[in-house]
Amino acid sequence: MNEFLNSKVFGIKWSRLLTNCQQTLYMVGWGLLIGTFFGLILALVLVLTRKGGVIQGKVSRILYAVVNVYVNVIRSVPFVILLVTIMPLTRLIMGTTIGSTAALVPLVLYISPYLARLLENSLLECSPGIIEAAQAMGANTWQIIRYFLMPETLGSMVLALTTGAIGLLGASAMAGYVGGGGVGDLTLTYGYEKMNTPLMILTVVILVVFVQLIQFLGGAVSRKLRAHR
Protein backbone atom coordinates (compact mmCIF):
# COMPACT_ATOMS: atom_id res chain seq x y z
CA MET A 1 0.00 0.00 0.00
CA ASN A 2 2.79 2.42 0.90
CA GLU A 3 4.51 1.61 -2.37
CA PHE A 4 1.36 2.58 -4.26
CA LEU A 5 0.90 5.82 -2.31
CA ASN A 6 4.52 6.80 -2.94
CA SER A 7 4.31 6.06 -6.66
CA LYS A 8 3.64 8.99 -8.98
CA VAL A 9 0.98 9.92 -11.51
CA PHE A 10 1.68 12.88 -13.80
CA GLY A 11 4.52 14.06 -11.55
CA ILE A 12 2.82 13.90 -8.14
CA LYS A 13 2.48 11.13 -5.58
CA TRP A 14 -0.80 9.28 -5.29
CA SER A 15 -0.79 10.16 -1.59
CA ARG A 16 -0.80 13.87 -2.45
CA LEU A 17 -3.60 13.42 -4.96
CA LEU A 18 -5.74 11.50 -2.46
CA THR A 19 -5.05 14.06 0.28
CA ASN A 20 -6.19 16.92 -1.93
CA CYS A 21 -9.32 15.01 -2.94
CA GLN A 22 -10.07 14.44 0.74
CA GLN A 23 -9.62 18.16 1.40
CA THR A 24 -12.13 18.96 -1.34
CA LEU A 25 -14.67 16.50 0.08
CA TYR A 26 -14.06 17.95 3.56
CA MET A 27 -14.75 21.51 2.40
CA VAL A 28 -17.82 20.54 0.38
CA GLY A 29 -19.23 18.27 3.11
CA TRP A 30 -18.88 20.64 6.05
CA GLY A 31 -19.60 23.70 3.93
CA LEU A 32 -22.85 22.14 2.71
CA LEU A 33 -23.86 21.00 6.20
CA ILE A 34 -23.29 24.37 7.87
CA GLY A 35 -24.53 26.30 4.83
CA THR A 36 -27.76 24.27 4.78
CA PHE A 37 -28.40 25.14 8.42
CA PHE A 38 -28.12 28.89 7.83
CA GLY A 39 -29.62 28.72 4.34
CA LEU A 40 -32.74 26.93 5.58
CA ILE A 41 -33.23 29.52 8.33
CA LEU A 42 -32.97 32.33 5.78
CA ALA A 43 -35.31 30.50 3.39
CA LEU A 44 -37.94 29.96 6.08
CA VAL A 45 -37.78 33.63 7.05
CA LEU A 46 -38.28 34.63 3.40
CA VAL A 47 -41.21 32.24 2.91
CA LEU A 48 -42.99 32.88 6.20
CA THR A 49 -42.67 36.69 6.21
CA ARG A 50 -43.29 37.40 2.53
CA LYS A 51 -46.54 39.07 1.43
CA GLY A 52 -49.30 36.53 2.01
CA GLY A 53 -47.07 34.38 4.21
CA VAL A 54 -47.88 32.78 7.54
CA ILE A 55 -46.35 35.61 9.60
CA GLN A 56 -47.61 39.11 8.86
CA GLY A 57 -47.05 42.51 10.43
CA LYS A 58 -44.68 45.47 10.34
CA VAL A 59 -41.78 43.58 11.92
CA SER A 60 -42.15 40.70 9.47
CA ARG A 61 -42.11 43.10 6.50
CA ILE A 62 -38.91 44.71 7.76
CA LEU A 63 -37.34 41.31 8.45
CA TYR A 64 -38.24 40.10 4.96
CA ALA A 65 -36.75 43.21 3.36
CA VAL A 66 -33.50 42.91 5.33
CA VAL A 67 -33.02 39.20 4.64
CA ASN A 68 -33.99 39.58 0.98
CA VAL A 69 -31.44 42.36 0.44
CA TYR A 70 -28.74 40.41 2.29
CA VAL A 71 -29.32 37.31 0.16
CA ASN A 72 -29.27 39.32 -3.07
CA VAL A 73 -26.13 41.28 -2.13
CA ILE A 74 -24.04 38.24 -1.16
CA ARG A 75 -25.19 36.29 -4.22
CA SER A 76 -24.14 39.15 -6.49
CA VAL A 77 -20.51 39.05 -5.29
CA PRO A 78 -18.25 36.60 -7.19
CA PHE A 79 -16.77 34.01 -4.85
CA VAL A 80 -13.14 34.90 -5.59
CA ILE A 81 -13.79 38.53 -4.60
CA LEU A 82 -15.71 37.46 -1.50
CA LEU A 83 -12.90 35.06 -0.59
CA VAL A 84 -10.30 37.83 -0.60
CA THR A 85 -12.52 40.53 0.90
CA ILE A 86 -13.41 38.63 4.08
CA MET A 87 -9.89 37.40 4.82
CA PRO A 88 -9.73 39.59 7.97
CA LEU A 89 -12.97 37.98 9.18
CA THR A 90 -11.62 34.52 8.39
CA ARG A 91 -8.44 35.27 10.34
CA LEU A 92 -10.50 36.62 13.26
CA ILE A 93 -12.66 33.48 13.45
CA MET A 94 -10.13 30.78 12.58
CA GLY A 95 -6.85 32.45 13.50
CA THR A 96 -5.54 31.87 9.97
CA THR A 97 -6.58 32.19 6.33
CA ILE A 98 -4.68 29.09 5.20
CA GLY A 99 -6.04 25.56 5.10
CA SER A 100 -9.26 23.72 4.36
CA THR A 101 -10.85 24.56 7.72
CA ALA A 102 -10.20 28.29 7.29
CA ALA A 103 -11.74 28.08 3.81
CA LEU A 104 -15.04 27.04 5.40
CA VAL A 105 -15.72 30.63 6.51
CA PRO A 106 -15.97 32.14 3.00
CA LEU A 107 -17.53 28.94 1.64
CA VAL A 108 -20.35 29.03 4.21
CA LEU A 109 -20.85 32.77 3.79
CA TYR A 110 -21.06 32.25 0.02
CA ILE A 111 -23.29 29.17 -0.09
CA SER A 112 -25.80 30.11 2.64
CA PRO A 113 -27.61 32.86 0.64
CA TYR A 114 -27.33 30.74 -2.51
CA LEU A 115 -29.02 27.82 -0.76
CA ALA A 116 -31.51 30.19 0.86
CA ARG A 117 -32.84 31.24 -2.54
CA LEU A 118 -32.92 27.67 -3.85
CA LEU A 119 -34.67 26.38 -0.73
CA GLU A 120 -37.08 29.32 -0.80
CA ASN A 121 -38.18 28.32 -4.30
CA SER A 122 -38.61 24.73 -3.13
CA LEU A 123 -40.68 25.72 -0.10
CA LEU A 124 -42.90 27.91 -2.26
CA GLU A 125 -43.91 24.79 -4.20
CA CYS A 126 -46.09 23.82 -1.26
CA SER A 127 -49.72 24.47 -2.19
CA PRO A 128 -51.27 27.47 -0.39
CA GLY A 129 -54.29 25.25 0.21
CA ILE A 130 -52.22 22.97 2.44
CA ILE A 131 -51.05 25.90 4.54
CA GLU A 132 -54.60 27.24 4.80
CA ALA A 133 -55.84 23.81 5.88
CA ALA A 134 -53.11 23.64 8.53
CA GLN A 135 -54.08 27.07 9.86
CA ALA A 136 -57.75 26.06 9.89
CA MET A 137 -56.83 23.08 12.08
CA GLY A 138 -55.16 25.45 14.54
CA ALA A 139 -51.54 24.57 13.73
CA ASN A 140 -48.96 27.08 14.96
CA THR A 141 -46.01 28.30 12.89
CA TRP A 142 -43.65 25.55 14.04
CA GLN A 143 -46.25 22.85 13.37
CA ILE A 144 -46.89 24.23 9.89
CA ILE A 145 -43.17 24.05 9.15
CA ARG A 146 -42.62 20.63 10.73
CA TYR A 147 -45.70 18.71 9.60
CA PHE A 148 -46.84 20.44 6.41
CA LEU A 149 -44.27 22.68 4.71
CA MET A 150 -41.16 20.52 5.07
CA PRO A 151 -42.66 17.09 4.25
CA GLU A 152 -44.43 18.44 1.16
CA THR A 153 -41.29 19.97 -0.32
CA LEU A 154 -38.54 17.64 0.93
CA GLY A 155 -37.90 16.03 -2.47
CA SER A 156 -37.55 19.43 -4.13
CA MET A 157 -35.27 20.64 -1.34
CA VAL A 158 -32.95 17.67 -1.89
CA LEU A 159 -32.60 18.71 -5.54
CA ALA A 160 -31.90 22.27 -4.38
CA LEU A 161 -29.18 21.01 -2.04
CA THR A 162 -27.75 18.93 -4.88
CA THR A 163 -27.44 22.05 -7.02
CA GLY A 164 -25.90 23.88 -4.07
CA ALA A 165 -23.38 21.09 -3.47
CA ILE A 166 -22.23 21.28 -7.08
CA GLY A 167 -21.85 25.05 -6.81
CA LEU A 168 -19.93 24.57 -3.57
CA LEU A 169 -17.62 22.09 -5.29
CA GLY A 170 -16.67 24.75 -7.83
CA ALA A 171 -16.16 27.31 -5.08
CA SER A 172 -13.94 24.91 -3.11
CA ALA A 173 -11.73 24.54 -6.18
CA MET A 174 -11.29 28.33 -6.25
CA ALA A 175 -10.48 28.32 -2.53
CA GLY A 176 -7.29 26.46 -3.45
CA TYR A 177 -5.95 29.60 -5.08
CA VAL A 178 -5.53 31.26 -1.68
CA GLY A 179 -4.22 28.27 0.25
CA GLY A 180 -7.48 26.43 0.88
CA GLY A 181 -6.08 23.15 -0.36
CA GLY A 182 -8.12 20.66 -2.33
CA VAL A 183 -8.17 19.86 -6.02
CA GLY A 184 -7.97 23.56 -6.93
CA ASP A 185 -4.68 23.96 -5.08
CA LEU A 186 -3.35 20.88 -6.84
CA THR A 187 -4.32 22.31 -10.23
CA LEU A 188 -2.63 25.65 -9.55
CA THR A 189 0.53 24.52 -7.74
CA TYR A 190 1.40 21.34 -9.59
CA GLY A 191 -0.55 21.83 -12.79
CA TYR A 192 -0.66 25.41 -14.02
CA GLU A 193 2.53 26.77 -12.41
CA LYS A 194 4.57 23.78 -13.62
CA MET A 195 2.85 23.64 -17.02
CA ASN A 196 1.71 20.10 -16.26
CA THR A 197 -1.19 19.81 -18.70
CA PRO A 198 -1.92 16.09 -18.08
CA LEU A 199 -2.32 16.81 -14.35
CA MET A 200 -4.68 19.69 -15.05
CA ILE A 201 -6.78 17.42 -17.25
CA LEU A 202 -6.78 14.79 -14.50
CA THR A 203 -8.08 17.29 -11.93
CA VAL A 204 -10.84 18.33 -14.34
CA VAL A 205 -11.82 14.68 -14.73
CA ILE A 206 -11.87 14.27 -10.93
CA LEU A 207 -14.18 17.28 -10.54
CA VAL A 208 -16.47 15.96 -13.30
CA VAL A 209 -16.67 12.60 -11.50
CA PHE A 210 -17.51 14.35 -8.22
CA VAL A 211 -20.28 16.35 -9.93
CA GLN A 212 -21.75 13.23 -11.53
CA LEU A 213 -21.75 11.39 -8.19
CA ILE A 214 -23.40 14.31 -6.39
CA GLN A 215 -26.04 14.66 -9.10
CA PHE A 216 -26.74 10.92 -9.17
CA LEU A 217 -27.09 10.62 -5.39
CA GLY A 218 -29.19 13.77 -5.10
CA GLY A 219 -31.51 12.69 -7.90
CA ALA A 220 -31.91 9.19 -6.45
CA VAL A 221 -32.74 10.48 -2.96
CA SER A 222 -35.17 13.05 -4.37
CA ARG A 223 -37.02 10.45 -6.45
CA LYS A 224 -37.31 8.14 -3.45
CA LEU A 225 -38.71 10.93 -1.26
CA ARG A 226 -41.21 11.99 -3.91
CA ALA A 227 -42.34 8.37 -4.36
CA HIS A 228 -43.08 8.03 -0.63
CA ARG A 229 -45.06 11.26 -0.28
Can you say where each PLM-predicted feature lies in the sequence?
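Short, strongly hydrophobic alpha-helical membrane anchors
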Residues: 1-20
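Membrane-water interface segments at the C-terminal ends of transmembrane alpha-helices
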Residues: 18-124, 159-166, 206-214
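Transmembrane alpha-helices
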Residues: 25, 139-171, 218
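C-terminal transmembrane helix and the adjacent membrane-cytosol boundary/short C-terminal tail
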Residues: 45-51, 136, 200-229
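Non-cytoplasmic
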Residues: 89-92, 160-209, 216
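Short cytoplasmic-facing helical segments at TM-TM junctions of multi-pass membrane proteins
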Residues: 118-157, 187, 227
